Amino acid sequence: MLPKLLVVGHGRHGKDTVCEMLEQYGYTFQSSSKFCSELFIFNDLKDLYGYANEEECYADRHNHRTEWYNMIHDYCKDDLARLGRNLFAEHNIYCGLRNKREFFAMKNEEIFDYAIWVDRTDHLPTEDPSSMSIEQWMCDYTIDNNSDLKRLKKNVDTLMRTIFRSRGLSLPASTQLPLFEEFADS
């Protein structure tokens, strides 16, 4: 069984890109924002902002970060690990958690195995704590996304090799591609 991964970091720092790369290792994911948009956010906001459909609501999420953060927190107010349990029931990656209280509730319930921070602070700003209260020090690992896409792929591969080795797991055949050999000595 694959270890469950919580992938976090500031907005637009590459979390979804990292999760897409993790699919080569057998993982599945859906952005937590997309999951929540489909589950309840679109229904709650469609009349307020005049969204024609869920896709339009989801595409506009960056303009309402604090509002989404608060809505997701309200969804979890009586059970801080609720969303994590729901997401991990369908996927083995939770991509995009933003609330530290929910983070610690899930960690205490051992809902995920590893928390991974995606960092791109050399190029992009950090978020205001009103929409992101998780901090890098809380996570088990950090993936550096301050270079190019090839380097990011190498960094993801290095981390996954470490995690798989520590768990006694074999890497999937899909990771034995020329892409991964390109950085073998770097």
What is the predicted role of each segment?
Residues 1-5:
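Extreme N-terminal starter segment of soluble prokaryotic enzymes
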Residues 6-22:
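Glycine-rich phosphate-binding P-loop
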Residues 23-31:
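Post-Walker A helix-loop "phosphate-sensing" segment adjacent to the P-loop in P-loop NTPases
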Residues 10-13, 32-37, 118-126:
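Short, acidic/turn-prone active-site loops that include or flank metal/cofactor-
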Residues 117-185:
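Small-molecule kinase domains that catalyze NTP-dependent phosphoryl transfer to phosphate-bearing small molecules
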